[in-house]
Amino acid sequence: MTYQQFVGDAAFRRHYWARNHLGWRHMEAARPNAAHMLLARWERCGAVPGVITQNVDLLHLKAGSRRLVDLHGTYAVVTCLDCGLRQSRWALHEQLDRLNPGFTERVATRGAIEIAPDADAVLTDTADFRMVDCPRCSGVLKPDIVYFGENVPAHRVQEANALVDGSDLVVVVGSSLTVLSLIHI
């Protein structure tokens, strides 16, 4: 999904939030693997000063990493594009449940809910789903995740650069480093 798709089309945005409403808890339930745990252990013993991740899944945090730069953001926070209000994804989930009573049950009656690799539910019909606006300014709410076509916020780039600049060695795990946001760090 691109940033322009998300901000430019209310129907596309509604479809995204309906899919995400059913699927995001699968990501929330995910647990760190051995690599996440090892990096957190290395940080605790001083072998690495911190972790920079492109992933939005919070697995490094769950593993115990303390100095963590979520370069591409996290699914656990929702931000208003107009006023900048930040709220937890859990808070938005509760609001969406109230606004869409029975939505999950209606979808479940159509069969098993398939979850895509991006942790969103695979849905075709989301026309009856209702999305909330920002409670402060009625603006558009977006997950605090960097989409294609969107820049990584400057403060995250600065944090990542500071972490790299203060290191003698950089260990790369699970990345080809070909994503533009990492090439210059």
Residue ranges and their predicted role:
Residues 1-184:
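Conserved catalytic core of sirtuin-type NAD+-dependent deacylases
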